[in-house]
């Protein structure tokens, strides 16, 4: 196993099975964040993650963190909160604001640089990257974004500026995703937060098998059309 240097003249990636064990999943470096390369990466179970000012690093960890939408864990307190939620939830209304929110609301710093913001915004304009927005009145207070691969959604990041805002985004999205044929959410690497929401780890080979099947699936043509998913009860 060795770290592969990508060429700017080819969007090809090495097999994820060749990724390093330590650091877990590091597969390649270099290349660029062009839409074609990003889409090729997601189709192969690979994602970018790197520090500002450093070379682009590409990862495919083993095990892989995933969330089966029907297994989303909602605490009793969250269920009570959602019943009287003051939030309105939309899809693809404000992709730029959501990714900017994910970039700026990180006390420990962020990998979401200006170049990353621009790259995913291009994916959004091409219909591949999508956002869920949580509004309190007319203020954006939380949200999440990711990349669609058929009936699998690759979650990238979320943010919250008010109580339970990001959890609301995930809850409403999971309900909508399941009801329209969505199968699986990729969480990349397990952490305490995603584990508390019901995410689990599966072997990389299993994730790649699911990906190869699900990316060929189709949600309804109008699923990603900008629309309101949830409104507070009056």
UniProtKB/Swiss-Prot annotation:
**GO term, biological process aspect, one:** protein catabolic process
Q: Reaction catalysed?
A: N-terminal L-lysyl-[protein] + L-leucyl-tRNA(Leu) = N-terminal L-leucyl-L-lysyl-[protein] + tRNA(Leu) + H(+); N-terminal L-arginyl-[protein] + L-leucyl-tRNA(Leu) = N-terminal L-leucyl-L-arginyl-[protein] + tRNA(Leu) + H(+); L-phenylalanyl-tRNA(Phe) + an N-terminal L-alpha-aminoacyl-[protein] = an N-terminal L-phenylalanyl-L-alpha-aminoacyl-[protein] + tRNA(Phe)
Q: Name one GO cellular component term.
A: cytoplasm
> EC number(s) in its UniProt entry?
2.3.2.6
Protein name per the record = Leucyl/phenylalanyl-tRNA--protein transferase
Keyword presence, Zinc: no
Task: Provide the coiled-coil residue spans.
Answer: none
**Gene3D superfamilies xrefs:** Leucyl/phenylalanyl-tRNA-protein transferase, C-terminal domain, Leucyl/phenylalanyl-tRNA-protein transferase, N-terminal domain
Matching entries from Pfam families are given as: Leu_Phe_trans
- UniProt similarity note: Belongs to the L/F-transferase family.
| Annotated TM spans | none
Query: What InterPro entries would the database entry show?
Result: Acyl_CoA_acyltransferase, Leu/Phe-tRNA_Trfase, Leu/Phe-tRNA_Trfase_C, Leu/Phe-tRNA_Trfase_N
Instruction: Write one Gene Ontology MF term.
Output: leucyl-tRNA--protein transferase activity
Q: Does the keyword Transmembrane helix apply?
A: no
Record's subcellular location: Cytoplasm
Subcellular location, principal: cytoplasm
| Annotated function | Functions in the N-end rule pathway of protein degradation where it conjugates Leu, Phe and, less efficiently, Met from aminoacyl-tRNAs to the N-termini of proteins containing an N-terminal arginine or lysine.
Q: Which UniProt keywords apply?
A: Acyltransferase, Cytoplasm, Transferase
